[in-house]
Every structure is written in structure tokens, then in C-alpha cells.
UniProtKB/Swiss-Prot annotation:
SUPFAM superfamilies: WD40 repeat-like. One of its GO terms (biological process) is rRNA processing. Keywords: Cytoplasm, Nucleus, Phosphoprotein, Repeat, rRNA processing, WD repeat. It is found in: Nucleus, Nucleolus; Cytoplasm. Residues 1-11 have a biased composition (Basic and acidic residues). WD repeats lie at residues 36-75, 82-121, 125-163, 166-205, 208-247, 250-289, 293-332. This is WD repeat-containing protein 55. SMART domains: WD40. The keyword Cytoplasm applies.
Length: 382
């Protein structure tokens, strides 16, 4: 059993306390404690097998923490200050032995996870600041920069395997199909890009949307592609129809800055208003709030290897953990029957609305109740 799961199960254990014990038992929390940084985090990633969380901040520092539900046991293991400018993305290798980081300083770094030692540096990996990073397999990774450039790298070789520039603006996010053949890119030019990394060729760009595309993820077992945008709208594409959107729906948020899939139908979206919304795809609706960074934009989201926790980072310089149990157990149809028009967002974790009266008046998502109902009735089928 995973250590984190063991700790959570211990809350319900029946072991009797030792009457002679002098020390109070350690408190077991629902989630690990918040981690406070000295600067906002701009990159966030969980280890694929261990209870470790990596973060890169706007000062260029990289941190690795061990996390635990046992109070006082979430600790910094090491930090690295090798980047000269903001560290914008971090990712663990498939075996968890390396941490890859990219930066505004145009460099890619490979760090040893156990020791925090810099093992390799590609100093001028791009001609422009690097903004996004995606692991393809144990040897290959993809990077995207501020001018729309995409590069594919094999860690066993010196130069890039592929170098393309089809977008006119920054690469905000990237995703990969299950066969690891097609690379999908979300760009500031409002287009979804499709690149065949097996044949190392460009496939197509979608029609531009009215705002920047800020995030991209596959849903519905790869049949749908969801893109978040700077205008607070989620755009949906059919897998075989990347040229134009198949559907869209707006959240009451100025911008969707990051998204992470939780199940094949549910994703979490972080927004500039500080709220982390749980969103169901087909039928399309916001089902509640997982958590929040009080009035501070949510920059990054990551899901733990066991699926129990969502981690988030915001401008408040905190890394927060959210319990996913209630969201995973949610039945969307039941939620529809209980939903009250104009009511507040449903809390999907014990901490969802824990800190600020600002959120008490946050209303149900959508342009208005009538429009939301019309969208739901249209979107209930694939």
C-alpha cells in the first residue's frame, strides 16, 4: 500500500493508545500541510512513484519536497539555483531518477533526484525563452518557447531531433496522444497545433480562437481534446477534427491558466480569480470548487501519482494540497438533480472555501442559468 494511503487509513485504525506514552500522537491530516516559498512557483510536478513534489519558482530556484499527511513531516529535501532566470516548468523522468527543468534563460537542466546534483545542462536549447516542457518517454522530451518554436530532444544525443515553428505566439502547454505519435500544442496565437513526432512533421493548426489557448489535455479516452483559454472558455475538439472546435462553454473566470485531468470526464481548472474548479466534460458543466488561493491567480496544477491529492501553486507563494476523494466519487447526474439555480459553487473538499469571505458570494458558473441549462441539454451526448 502507498505510504500516503497508509497514513490516511491510520485515521480509522482501532489500535489502543499506550496509557504510559508521554508523547502525544502525531496528528494525521486530510492533506499535507501547505508549503511556503520565497517566490511564486511557475512549475510544479509530482514524482511518478514516491511522495515527492518538485517546484520551480520565478527566481530560477528548483525545490524538491517530501510530503506527508502526518503533521510536521512535509519537508524540503534539496534546492538548486542553477537557472539564471525564472524556472517555468519541471517534470520527473519516467523512472523518477531525474528531474528535468526549463527556464526563461533558454536552458534545459537535468538534475539527480536523490542528490539534487546538476548532471547535464543544455545552455542554449532555444533561441528564445522556454515556456513549456513535456516528457515523451524515458529518453525523449519536447519543449516550446516564447516565439512559438517546438523542439524535440533525445537525451542520448546532443542536438534537437525536431525543430519547427508554426505558431505565431508562445507555446503555453503541450499534450501527447496515448500512442505517443501526435504532439498537441496550445499557443498564445489562439490555435491548437498538431505535430507528428514519429515522422517529425507538422500536421495542422486549428482555426484561431478569440483568446490565447493556455492549456490542453485529452479527455474521454482520447476522443476529445479540451483547451483552456485566456477568456475563461473551455474549447473542445474531436480527435479527428482538430481544424475547428466541436463545442465550447464559458466559466465565470477571467482566464483559465492551467488544467489537469482527474478522470476521463472530470478535470480541474485553475483561474485568475484564485478558484480551482472541477469541470465535467460531456455533459459540460462546472460541478464545484476543489479549493482556492485567496484572490490570487492559480498558476499550476498537478495530480499525485496515487491520484489522492491535487497540488496547486499561486501568486500567494504557497503550494497547497487538495483531497480528491470527494471529486472522484462524484456522480454528475446526482449533482444535477440537487443543483440550485444561482447557488454557490459546491465544495468538493473540506478546505474548498476555508479562508476568505470573498468567495462566499461566488455564484454558479455560466453566463446565466438559462444559458447554462441550454448548453447542458445540448452537450449531454457525444
Amino acid at each position: 500500500m502507498d505510504r500516503m494511503c497508509e497514513e490516511r487509513a491510520a485515521e480509522d485504525g482501532s489500535d489502543e493508545e499506550d496509557p504510559d506514552a508521554t508523547e502525544a500522537p502525531a496528528r494525521i491530516r486530510d492533506t499535507p500541510e501547505d508549503i511556503v516559498l520565497e517566490a511564486p512557483a511557475s512549475g510544479l510536478a509530482f514524482h511518478p512513484a514516491r511522495d515527492l513534489l518538485a517546484a520551480g519558482d520565478v527566481d530560477g530556484d528548483v525545490f524538491v519536497f517530501s510530503y506527508s499527511c502526518q503533521e510536521g513531516e512535509t519537508k524540503e529535501l534539496w534546492s538548486s539555483g542553477h537557472h539564471l532566470k525564472s524556472c517555468r516548468a519541471v517534470v520527473f523522468s519516467e523512472d523518477g531518477q531525474k528531474l528535468v527543468t526549463v527556464s526563461k534563460d533558454k536552458a534545459i537542466h537535468f538534475l539527480d533526484v536523490e542528490l539534487g546534483r546538476l548532471e547535464r545542462r543544455i545552455s542554449k536549447a532555444h533561441g528564445a525563452p522556454i515556456n513549456s516542457l513535456l516528457l515523451v518517454d524515458e529518453n525523449v522530451l519536447a519543449t516550446g518557447d516564447d516565439t512559438g518554436g517546438i523542439r524535440l530532444w533525445d537525451q542520448r544525443k546532443e542536438g534537437p531531433l525536431m525543430d519547427m515553428r508554426q505558431h505565431e505566439e508562445y507555446i503555453a502547454d503541450m499534450a501527447l496522444d496515448p500512442d505517443k505519435k501526435l504532439l498537441l500544442t496550445a499557443s498564445g496565437d489562439g490555435c491548437l497545433g498538431v505535430f507528428n513526432i514519429k515522422r517529425r512533421r507538422f500536421e495542422l493548426l486549428s482555426e484561431p480562437q478569440s483568446g490565447d489557448l493556455t492549456s490542453v489535455t485529452l479527455m474521454k479516452y482520447g476522443r476529445k481534446v479540451a483547451c483552456g483559454s485566456s477568456e475563461g472558455t473551455i474549447y473542445l475538439f474531436n480527435w479527428d477534427g482538430f481544424g475547428a472546435t466541436s463545442d465550447r462553454f464559458a466559466l465565470r473566470a477571467e482566464s483559465i491558466d492551467c488544467m489537469v485531468p482527474v478522470t476521463e470526464s472530470l478535470l480541474c481548472a485553475g483561474s485568475t480569480d484564485g478558484v480551482i474548479r472541477a469541470v465535467n466534460i460531456l455533459p459540460n458543466r462546472v460541478v464545484g470548487s476543489v479549493g482556492q488561493h485567496a484572490e490570487e491567480p492559480v498558476e499550476n496544477l498537478a495530480l499525485s501519482h496515487c491520484g489522492c491529492f491535487l497540488a496547486s501553486s499561486g501568486h500567494d507563494q504557497r503550494l497547497k494540497f487538495w483531497d480528491m476523494a470527494q471529486l472522484r466519487a462524484l456522480v454528475v447526474d446526482d449533482y444535477r438533480r440537487r443543483k440550485k439555480k444561482g447557488g454557490p459553487l459546491r465544495a468538493l473538499s473540506s478546505k474548498a472555501w476555508s479562508t476568505d469571505d470573498f468567495f462566499a458570494g461566488l455564484r454558479e458558473e455560466g453566463e446565466d442559468a438559462k444559458t447554462l441549462e441550454e448548453e447542458e441539454s445540448e452537450d449531454d451526448s457525444d
